[in-house]
Amino acid sequence: MKKILELGEPISATYSHAAHTLAILANEKNNRDWLMNCFIQIFGGENDFLDYQDFGFMECPLIHTQHIGIDMVDIGWKNRLDFVKMAIINNYYIYAEMNVSKINAYEINKPFAHDALVYGFDEENKRFLISDFIGLKKYGSAWI
């Protein structure tokens, strides 16, 4: 079995958590008004103070999120990969922190935790499709 959830081009790809959310939202044209009104804020004045506020994807009204602890995954499934496949089959994206030193696409040798978006799998080739700053460079997708 093979399944890939829809993912578009994010309007901004600065931080992974925002890029993942924006890539999911990119497929819906109805989301554009909200994104332009509440996410993209462009304003400049001569002596304006810019107060940085992070984008909280958990508070995005256009996406329903659930936080499932790894302990719950371990209780309910024989293996974590089965949980990921089941979630994708049911049209859920998986946002997870991973040790990217274990993933060749990242080209990192030392243990390093980074958040990736898992949105597809291919059982025949035993691989998953992720989106992230692969190799901590440009935002994109890779089969792992």
Language-model features: where?
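Conserved active-site-adjacent core of cysteine acyl-enzyme catalytic domains
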Residues: 2-28, 33-144
